[in-house]
């Protein structure tokens, strides 16, 4: 099974507001950068969207080390939040509907093809790949504002 390292990040200009995401995929000496934007979204949705997009681009099942500076994204897997939400019919412990449920369900489906290790990195620090993802996300927002990226 191929081993792939992925870095992801999401950003929002206003929350909610125009948002972007970036991802860097590394396999051996190969590297791929992805990004996208939405006209009205939240930073949390962009964090999840980055992971979905990165995992979706993998053509076969892989062993993935996915790094994100989003505690929300990483802890949903590492702390068992997603499993608990599913068991509880997508309700929080306070019996409220889970936010971003559409994206969480999509991420679970896409991630199920792979062996994913969810890893937290410190945001806006000295990690060049995480910093690059942030640059990609912010550039996607800027491009959206210039109408260079069609919104989905």
From Swiss-Prot:
A Gene Ontology biological process in which this protein takes part is: DNA replication, removal of RNA primer
> Which cofactors does it use?
Mg(2+)
UniProt-recorded name of the protein: Ribonuclease H
Which Gene3D superfamilies is this protein grouped with? Ribonuclease H-like superfamily/Ribonuclease H
Localization of this protein? Cytoplasm
Q: Which cysteines are joined by disulfide bonds?
A: none
Keyword terms of this UniProt record: Cytoplasm, Endonuclease, Hydrolase, Magnesium, Metal-binding, Nuclease
Summarizing the function annotation, the protein's role is: Endonuclease that specifically degrades the RNA of RNA-DNA hybrids.
Which SUPFAM superfamilies has this protein been placed in?
Ribonuclease H-like
Q: Which residues form the RNase H type-1 domain?
A: 1-142
Annotated positions binding Mg(2+) 1: 9, 47, 69
GO MF annotation: an example: nucleic acid binding
Q: What is the top EC class of this enzyme, as a single word? A: hydrolase
User: What is the originating organism of this protein?
Assistant: Moorella thermoacetica (strain ATCC 39073 / JCM 9320)
Q: Which gene encodes it?
A: rnhA
E.C. number: 3.1.26.4
Provide the catalytic activity annotation.
Answer: Endonucleolytic cleavage to 5'-phosphomonoester
Cofactor notes: Binds 1 Mg(2+) ion per subunit. May bind a second metal ion at a regulatory site, or after substrate binding.
Query: Which GO cellular component term is one of those annotated?
Result: cytoplasm
